[in-house]
Amino acid sequence: YQVAKPAKVISFNSPKIKVLFAGQYNLYMQQDADMLIDCLIKSKDLSELKEHYVYTFLGKGWDNHVERLNKAGYETHHIKFAPDYIEEICKHDIQVTPICIGTGTKGKVLDAIANGLLVVGSWYALENIAVEHNVSCIQYEEIKDVVNILKKIHLNPSKYEAIAECGRENILQKHNGETTSKELFCLFK
């Protein structure tokens, strides 16, 4: 992972909380991303989700999702490529990661957490990462749960800012390449 210098200030206090979907729309996210967009559009509390959030999709293949959310009245943006990926993700508060297939540790998830974003993800998105639900990340069981999670976040932003900070500290400490290398090479002494 890469970390921005200076470190991002974790604060969900701008006019709207900025939600990021990062990575290509592909096999790993297709099923759950499609279901999440349907849930957002069909939500009974649509105005609440529109009023408090802006949604950005970073990566290729999200055109249909952006168009559908825009038609439903959401403030939605699409960035197909960011020349400085870390700088771009640091402009956001939350990263939703609807990965539905296990593939090991996710670099984009590590980047997000290490840079102070609150990651809301599936078990697959968070596998092999030193985080804990409701302590250093938010892990959902079913994709439809993300709608209720978003409703809770805007009602108590300081709680979720603290979770994001704990996540950042965990990643910087437990996924530190230099420390891990030293520990590994100590095994061979």
Question: Model-found features: residue ranges?
Answer:
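A charged, aromatic-enriched C-terminal amphipathic alpha-helix characteristic of glycosyltransferases
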Residues: S158-F188
